[in-house]
Amino acid sequence: MGQLSALLTYSFMILMSLMMISMVFVMITMAEESGKRIAEVLTEGSTLHNPENPVYDVKDGSVDFDQVSFKYSQAAERMALADIDLHIRSGETIGIIGGTGSSKSSLVQLISRLYDATEGRVRVGGVDVKDYDLETLRNQVAMVLQKNVLFSGTIKENLRWGSESATDEELVHACKLAQADEFVSQFPDGYDTYIEQGGTNVSGGQKQRLCIARALLKKPKILILDDSTSAVDTKTDALIRKAMREFIPETTKIIIAQRTASVEDADRIIVMEGGRINGIGTHRELMENNEIYREIYTSQNKAGDQDA
């Protein structure tokens, strides 16, 4: 009986060892494939380069799309953007609205040259974006995304990613425009409050407002808000837009939003559908002439009435 028990014990130990060895081989195979993908990322060269004689000055915040079409890959069958002909004046406030997958974000990513247009030309300040020094262009085109990042460090340190040389007064002013100063001032340590990695110790709306303030510190010619007030209540959202109209009128402001309330007071609103411009106009003009905008507005206001 003892010999049988010993045999079973040793057999079980051998079986476990064989299983662990097989798991090691599986992990080695997975690690090898992961290593290949990491190496591909590290060795991938940029397809965007500075021209031989780059332009180092962005004259103003005007933006022109001249018959622009774009797709993310040359192998792609369908254009993400098609036949975009759009002219934005410097200092103008532009709203962009449309359904999911209508390429709203793709449109604005061409302005800061995160991608190059497949066809046509994109100009900023009257100059083709391909002719600019990349760093110069991107310093003058500030983008705030819906899920922007805060880093571990104090609020001051996070804000100074927008401008390392910003004074304390400039930090406070930017936060006031972004409607962030009020809640920051309520923290025991104020602007020296420590932010956890990813901003986990502040709410989504507070994080978005701090990211907007950080972008404002760059003093850009063009400010792009890509659904970056989605976690902010409508009253605060309106106060942010009001402050921008009053204090940075010379800055071109492009607001991508899901809520019509976020773009109603824009100088012009662009309605996107299927990678194309479906309509352009003021809120009143689109309510009269654009079915897509009217449907979005009606559905959101019906939902608001039901919630009330």
Residue ranges and their predicted role:
Residues 56-308:
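ABC-type nucleotide-binding domain
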Residues 13-41:
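Cytosolic ends of transmembrane helices, especially the final helix of ABC transmembrane type-1 domains
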Residues 47-58:
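Pre-NBD coupling/linker segments of ABC/ABC-like ATPases
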Residues 27-30, 47, 71-76:
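An intracellular "coupling" helix at the cytosolic face of ABC transporter transmembrane type-1 domains
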Residues 1-9:
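Membrane-water interface of transmembrane alpha-helices in multipass transporters/channels
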Residues 40, 47, 160:
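Conserved E/DxxT/N motif and adjacent residues on the DHp alpha2 helix
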